Amino acid sequence: MKSLTLIGLAFGASLALSTAALAQDIPVAVAGPMTGGESAFGRQMKNGAEQAVDDINAAGGVLGKKLSLQVGDDACDPKQARSVAEKFASAKIPFVAGHYCSSSSIPASEAYAEGNVLQITPASTNPLFTERKLWNVARVCGRDDQQGGVAGQYIAKNYKGKNIAILNDKTTYGKGLADETKKALNKAGVTEKMFESYNKGDKDFAAIVSRMKRDNIDLVYVGGYHQESGLLVRQMRDQGLKTVLMAGDALADKEFATITGAAGEGTLFTFGPDPRNKPTAKAIVEKFKAKNIDPEGYTLYTYAALQVWSKAAAKAGTTDPKKVMDTIKAGEWDTVIGKLGFDAKGDIKVIDYVVYKWDAKGNYAEINPKGS
């Protein structure tokens, strides 16, 4: 790629954009947790964006110009995300693929809207991101009311008559997903025995594990991220609990297995059908493998976000964010994760969550793989 710039952690860090590069290239950005507890997903996003920019540039770029990629680190912190967004907006970057955490994407989107920046998130699933109907937002992933619905139905079908617990980490993503799962579960006629919260960043779950043990919990659904979920499942096993842990898409990184070790076997989570298995992704997956990168989780979703924007800009004949967004919503776009169309709010029109299971070797696979 032509250039790669990282926006650091400090709020006062300057946006290191080369004037010469800007004169020749079109600056685009990826923003997410490049540091902090969710940095594994930031790496996924950065890998996906870098490969997409390389491939777009190799094919001639956009409107006759190469793309230059900027990287913003929000550490999944809302204030830091807003700061990153303001810097990108002041630099007149027309497009950002980001962010990862919903608690980052939502405040960042307001700064992008004010600064005339188009934002497509590969990963933020909280419904509020698009329900506010900002002109500048879209996502290439599903929503928690859809993901929670699949999880709730799965639990109701497979754990009927069992003792269920629901936990959440109080974050925008975690609490929202837990609430949607509870809603679907209750609608199916199942009432959870335990509903509790913890704080993101907690490491000691002894009190929660003790209550689960006392209440004979068969399955615990966690609305939260992979670090805390991994520690929880380890502590459950240490206390002799065979309780199954189920969570959402935040478990779609092999760092979860690094945290859990053998204790993670049998853990369930929801995510879209594995894009690595799609025929549309075969050539791109091979490129990643040649670099010794596993394009898991949101890697290919980030790649797809860049594809949608670049194709729409080419069709619109401009990088003007509002004109490109109008073009995005008016069309359908062939991407590495399949054909995508968007509704008026910026949500994709076809959603298809499935359930995955972690195995003893630290790998995950769809329980009922669809492969396309």
Regions found by a protein language model. Give the residues of each.
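Sec/Tat signal peptide C-region and signal peptidase I cleavage site
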Residues: 17-23
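Extracytosolic ligand-binding ectodomains
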Residues: 1-11, 23-372
